[in-house]
Amino acid sequence: MFANYNYNDFPIVKVDLSGNIENNEDFLNFTNQWLQLYNKKQEFEFIFDTYKCGLINPKYCLYTALFIKKIKQEKIQYLKKSIIYVYNKYIFHLLKIIFYIEKPVAPIDIIFNDLLNNSTTIQTI
């Protein structure tokens, strides 16, 4: 499974993104769990960890942007903040594409840990 949601620290929801999105079913699993959080009608925050994330087909940038657009149409936004830990430039650039196409639902801190150059960059969107 591409996205593993951990609700143990709710309202902080940790999402471990591992491997690749093998098919649309993997992507729908990721978005359906997000929608289930909205159905609870309680505020929450995301912490995404992409350390084990593989190469993702860029088409999922568009799918994610369209999903964000759909979420933004909700009358009440329960997502209050996200932190995304990124460890490679490829994933970092995919995120930039997503948020260029569609602005995020809530403030996001992207923490890019460049393991090759031993540096950390924080970008707030």
Where are these regions (language model features)?
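Amphipathic, Lys/Arg-enriched alpha-helical "gate/interface" segment within cytosolic domains
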Residues: 1-125
